[in-house]
Amino acid sequence: MKFPTDLIEGRLVKRYKRFFADVELADGEVVTAHCANTGAMTGIKTPGLPVWLSRSDNPKRKLKYTWELVEAEGTLIGALPNLANSLAEEAVNAGVISELTGYDSLRREVKYGENSRIDLLLEGNDRPPCWVEVKNVHWQRGPGIAEFPDGVTSRGAKHLVELANQVQAGERAVQLFIVQRSDCDVLRPAEDIDPVYARTLRDSAAAGVEVLAYACEVSPTAVIIHRPMRVELSQ
């Protein structure tokens, strides 16, 4: 997925109140950018890190800038979790995610479960519907190892239970992790951060939910899903 405009490089001054980040630009000006990542952002919110911003000239916006990328541990990382759904849709349509090919239609945000909306619903070609829940991952905890989540997510565990229910109903369900960095080969649940989520992920996989992970190539011009990763669920 290409960025529609050129990104602006700066240095992170601080991230605060979840939605805001102060960034020093190359000319010394400090601007406030919208931070669309409301999570813990573990490892990618350290003051001084290089960051990239997009700029909007929409007069209705309170903040002109949006925090898009960050460089940590020598690697560019996508900072927008909500981009993961669009990346997944683009990759499915392009046939990049081989496990999710062969369907006639793709819909987003379809209601299911208990007041939930599935990220992607694949249908058609005389196949059972395929319910795909997408989770964004940015956190590297060891060389080549990405982990999720970086904070407790009861909502994420709820989604896994709902995916398992779809399998029980005779349909297909997939938990898809989009890792917005290129330096990881393995995806693991962060057992110490959220043991309930880790256990629920293993239980749902045992019940037939497919667990996939894909890494991205990240640059100041685009973020693109490009290769599968190994998933390790054992403790």
UniProtKB/Swiss-Prot annotation:
Matching InterPro entries: SfsA, SfsA_C, SfsA_N
Ranges in a coiled coil: none
GO molecular function annotation: DNA binding
Residues passing through the membrane, by range: none
HAMAP family (UniProt xref): SfsA
Family: Belongs to the SfsA family.
Protein name: Sugar fermentation stimulation protein homolog
Organism: Maricaulis maris (strain MCS10)
Gene: sfsA
